[in-house]
Curated annotation (Swiss-Prot):
Functional summary from the UniProt entry: Catalyzes the isomerization of sedoheptulose 7-phosphate in D-glycero-D-manno-heptose 7-phosphate.
Domain of life the protein comes from: Bacteria
Cofactor: how bound: Binds 1 zinc ion per subunit.
Gene Ontology CC annotations of this record: cytoplasm; DnaA-DiaA complex
Matching PROSITE patterns: SIS
Entry-linked HAMAP family: GmhA (MF_00067)
InterPro entries, A to Z: GmhA/DiaA, Phosphoheptose_Isoase, SIS_dom, SIS_dom_sf, SIS_GmhA/DiaA_subfam
Name of protein: Phosphoheptose isomerase
Amino acid sequence: MEIEDKIRKAYEESVRVKEQFFRENISLIKEVAEIIAKSLNEGGKILIFGNGGSATDASHIAAEFVNRFKRERPGLPAIALNTDMAVLTAIANDYDYSEIFAKQVKALGESGDIVIGISTSGSSRNVIKAIEVAKKRGLKSIAFTSKKGEKLISKVDYAFAVPSEDTPRIQETHITLGHILCELVEDILFEIPAAKKKLKQ
């Protein structure tokens, strides 16, 4: 295959997957954005996590909430649980790698918080264990995964399953979803005067 054809095939497939995903999930995206905004407005926070490329997506999305996305506004509390090397290696060394997110959810998760687990395969044991802990503690849980992620999908309150088995296409859709959710949450919280008053300035 010529280089130009390979480039064209990659971006066309990326566009196709995203178009199908967002067409099928537009109502769910709106619902989840409202749930996240409600949690943040009532003093909750976001705990988000994943492995590898999904870890960088988690860090990226958390940064957009804590800093800003498109609006000048107060920071919103979001913690990527895959960023603290001391915590991660201590848990993995003393217990098991499958516990690295679950123990953090136990330590940091509080009533009203939102947990977002990102796994392209939907079978990452450490992500699934953390979701199980979140459910036991009464936290709302959201998954970013793919159509093959039945294990994770079955555990969460809200699941976003990308209609692809190609990891790059799945991850490209996940970060776009994260951006859209952040933009919607900003719009909800900072365009509604009543919500603005409740947030800590």
